[in-house]
Amino acid sequence: MTVLSEKELIQIRRHLHEIPELALQEKETHDYLLKVIKNLKQDHLTIVVPKTLPTAILGLVKGINPKKTIGYRTDIDALPVQEKTGLPFTSKHSGIMHACGHDIHMTVALGLLSYFSENQPKDNLLFFFQPAEESESGGKQAYEKGLFQGKFKPDEFYGLHDNPELPAGSIGCRMGTLFAGTTEINIDVIGKSGHAAFPQNANDTVVAAANLIMQIQTIISRSIDPIQSGVITLGKVNAGVIRNVIAGHTRIEGTIRGLTQKMILQIDRRLQDVCDGIAHSYNVEVNLELNQGGYWPVENDPKITKNFISYMKKNPKVNFIETEPKMTGEDFGFLLAKFPGTMFWLGVGDPSSQLHSSTLNPDEKSIQSGIDAIKGFLIDRMG
């Protein structure tokens, strides 16, 4: 075997793009990845398919004189989006698309694994092909199911996300938080229904919910440090069945975004306080359910990230860009809360489309550029 060429990598990416699958359903993707990996040089490579997370793959490249294990993660799932790119290798699965660029992510990981299977690294390298990033918290599942134990426990962890706003092949990163953490909000306001003409005999949940919504909006402006960033969006409200009956139940659904886990927990506490206050004021029951799952803020480790940025800045072949944090979520944040590491951007040069767009069309030249930059950093990191 030889290291996968740029031409071969592009063909791999195009095939992966044709077979997108949703979270925990990535069977065809998994089988194709496994086929490619098994065709690589196996002398120093151990491949594991965990029974507890069967669409995941762990690939461990044994180092020459290992002092540590460096982890590299890629996600493998797709989104329920109908593709509208018109590409000759468009999705073969109706209503499903790699609209977040995970086909690019996987291809870069395969390129790195291909190189290090042929060129044995100094330290151990762990490659984690992770299912269910877009939903179902695949990273958290992997951790809780014990995938990262023994020789598969990384001392530090890295991962990338493609960014259509950045020039193709560029690398973007920052100290601190790269992605916000997210928490789902579900609130049930329960009162007593009644005739619209006799409000004194009912407990109106619509009025209570309306005031609750307004009070929640004060949390960011009055309970959070204005230098920090946080968002509470309540995107769905359901109440009542007919115009002349006071609603006995109102459902509110929304999301929290915060740049640190500390901030998210602070918002959680204030939400509960506000709900309790509305319940008391309007004589209703207010049940608050918060679900963060594995979507913690992606908080880059200071020491490791400083080293990463320093390398990328001094490498004349890398177009490095200091970036701002994004309020979108990424479940690699959970793993970075367990293992020190860094997440970074790979520019894919499609500024006309956003992530999760049905027209996302990454520039394939970014694949080899990304591999070269990351490969160089990993070699430098191992000393």
UniProtKB/Swiss-Prot annotation:
Protein name in UniProt: N-acetyldiaminopimelate deacetylase
Coiled coil (residue ranges): none
EC number(s) on file: 3.5.1.47
Gene Ontology terms: biological process: diaminopimelate biosynthetic process; lysine biosynthetic process via diaminopimelate
Recorded family membership: Belongs to the peptidase M20A family. N-acetyldiaminopimelate deacetylase subfamily.
Pathway of action: Amino-acid biosynthesis; L-lysine biosynthesis via DAP pathway; LL-2,6-diaminopimelate from (S)-tetrahydrodipicolinate (acetylase route): step 3/3
Organism expressing this protein natively: Lactobacillus acidophilus (strain ATCC 700396 / NCK56 / N2 / NCFM)
MF annotations from Gene Ontology: N-acetyldiaminopimelate deacetylase activity
Summary of the function given for this chain in its UniProt record: Catalyzes the conversion of N-acetyl-diaminopimelate to diaminopimelate and acetate.
UniProt xrefs under InterPro entries: AcetylDAP_deacetylase, Amidohydrolase, Bact_exopeptidase_dim_dom, Peptidase_M20, Peptidase_M20_dimer
CDD domains associated with the record: M20_Acy1_YkuR-like
Domain of life: Bacteria
Positions annotated as active site in the UniProt record: D75, E134
Class in the EC hierarchy, top level: hydrolase
Keywords: Amino-acid biosynthesis, Diaminopimelate biosynthesis, Hydrolase, Lysine biosynthesis
Keyword check for Ribonucleoprotein: no
Catalytic activity: N-acetyl-(2S,6S)-2,6-diaminopimelate + H2O = (2S,6S)-2,6-diaminopimelate + acetate
NCBIfam families recorded: amidohydrolases
Alphabetical list of Gene3D superfamilies matching this protein: 3.30.70.360, Zn peptidases
